[in-house]
Amino acid sequence: MFKVNKDSAYNFKFPGAKVSIEKNSFYTDKMIQIFEENNLLHVDKDSIPLLKGITIKMDISRYNDSIRNRTYIGRIGENKKSSFVSSKKEENYVIAKVNNLGDFVIKIDSIKPNVSVIDISDNQWISNRKNLSIKISDNESGVKNYRGTI
């Protein structure tokens, strides 16, 4: 347990993760439990409200380049399922600013997005069409951006 004064900034370092808490991130002074164990970063409970987000950095140096490009931070929910946390990569870290405390892990996006054409049937001629409708979905990490070319 660590005492976190709301008027102070903190940096916690673990073998595979770092946590940065800015000044005034909490509404009041708190005792929080924070640790890393078996590749899981535990930052207390989701029930503690935050005034500002905190930054978590998780080390991905143990992965080779082809896997490192597909890593993201997953937040473990009450149902033990992980949900995607928006993040960016810098050097050997995946970095996210989170607005909720909880448990975080490195996940690897192993499922390709699904791209399907809407309102066109097989062997249908499309050269006279002005618009094409396409549905893009991804059940794992989501689709951040896309580009279509014909």
How would you describe each model-predicted region?
Residues 74-90:
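Solvent-exposed beta-strand/loop surfaces of large extracellular or lumenal domains
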Residues 66-69, 137-150:
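Solvent-exposed loop/turn segments flanking beta-strands in beta-repeat/beta-sandwich domains
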Residues 117-123:
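Short, solvent-exposed loop/edge segments of extracellular or virion-exposed proteins
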